[in-house]
């Protein structure tokens, strides 16, 4: 089968399309014939050796896949050949087939296409865990989403609206804000034109946002924290800006607020049943049209480098998908 391989830490253009042996389903596993693999920003960091998870070489990028069950190993009873499924794989999704533990695979309905299905797991899984499990939101509270037109940010906008929150999209262009407003945001703040701290105070009539969802980091994090409401919750999702901010902890004291880390991957590993229930709920909501799982663009497997460069250049609004 064909696979995109990273054999040493490198840039996207250094990845190689190669032939590798087909996987075999061991006991408790199933082999998925991959129809769509979703890329995330951390895939770039992973191939560069800058991510906290460092798979052994050679490995493939792409941590979430959708496809069809091709074979099952001994002891697997809840999956059968031909089932349409999604799964989170951590890495190795940029290939034609993959063997995974059967208990990590979730079925999808016929009315949910593979491209949209592949993009559900990580961004919506992260956003749902962040908002539902870490933020403990109350209906009517204000949610400010940084990087609101990116994958995780867009998921937070949609889920925030479903939870009855007042969503403020924060992004670097008016085009991105309009996109976020079409996906659940009520208000928008262009932080390329207006100071983020002052803008959030203005849009909340001086109170500040109750929940701040930050997948961006960099200089925006402190500005957002300075605008947070009393007893607000600041959710640390990631650092797409590249810089990990150093936050003055006196702000947490003065605001009576919480700074809460969100590491969906580790939480999912430690809470597999709750994570599975979350994914099944997200699949149902997407199939029902309550969530968009918007796909920005697709690429054939051989053009994985081009797909990663779209993410690196902040050009995607929604998911970037590979077709093996």
PLM segments and residue spans:
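C-terminal capping/lid region of NAD(P)-dependent oxidoreductase domains
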Residues: 283, 288-297, 305-324
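Adenosine-nucleotide cofactor-binding segment
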Residues: 145, 161-220, 273-277
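Glycine-rich beta-strand-centered segment in the early N-terminal region that forms part
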Residues: 21-38, 50-92
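N-terminal Rossmann-fold NAD(P) dinucleotide-binding loop
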Residues: 153-154
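NAD(P)H dinucleotide-binding glycine-rich loop of Rossmann-like/cofactor-binding domains
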Residues: 33, 45, 71, 84-149, ...
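Residues located in well-ordered beta-strands
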Residues: 2, 16, 21, 33, ...
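Glycine-rich phosphate-binding loop and adjacent beta-alpha segment
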Residues: 219-291, 323-324
């Amino acid at each position: 089968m064909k696979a995109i391989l990273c054999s040493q830490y490198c840039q996207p253009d250094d990845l190689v399309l190669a032939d590798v042996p087909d996987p075999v389903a061991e006991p408790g596993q199933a082999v998925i014939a991959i129809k769509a693999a979703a890329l995330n920003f951390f895939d770039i960091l992973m191939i560069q050796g800058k991510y906290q998870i460092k798979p052994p070489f050679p490995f493939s990028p792409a941590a979430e896949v959708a496809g069809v069950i091709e074979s099952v190993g001994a002891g697997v009873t809840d999956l059968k050949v031909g089932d349409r499924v999604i799964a989170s794989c951590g890495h190795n999704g940029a290939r034609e087939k993959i063997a995974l533990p059967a208990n990590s695979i979730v079925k999808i309905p016929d009315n949910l296409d593979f491209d949209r299905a592949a993009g559900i797991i990580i961004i919506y899984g992260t956003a749902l865990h962040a908002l539902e499990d870490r933020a403990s939101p109350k209906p009517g509270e204000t949610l400010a989403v940084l990087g609101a037109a990116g994958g995780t940010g867009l998921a937070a906008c949609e889920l925030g609206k479903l939870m009855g929150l007042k969503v403020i999209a924060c992004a670097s262009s008016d085009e991105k804000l309009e996109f976020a407003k079409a996906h659940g945001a009520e208000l928008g703040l262009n932080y390329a034109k207006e100071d983020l701290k002052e803008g959030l105070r203005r849009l909340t009539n001086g109170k500040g946002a109750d929940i701040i969802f930050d997948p961006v980091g960099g200089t925006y994090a402190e500005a957002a924290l300075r605008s947070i409401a009393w007893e607000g919750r600041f959710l640390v999702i990631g650092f797409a800006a590249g810089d990990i901010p150093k936050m003055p902890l006196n702000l947490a004291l003065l605001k009576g607020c919480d700074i809460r880390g969100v590491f969906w991957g580790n939480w999912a590993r430690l809470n597999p049943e709750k994570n599975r229930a979350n994914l099944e709920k997200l699949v149902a909501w997407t199939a029902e049209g309550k969530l968009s799982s918007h796909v920005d663009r697709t690429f054939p497997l051989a053009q994985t480098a081009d797909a990663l460069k779209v993410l690196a250049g902040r050009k995607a609004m929604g998911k970037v998908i590979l077709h093996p």
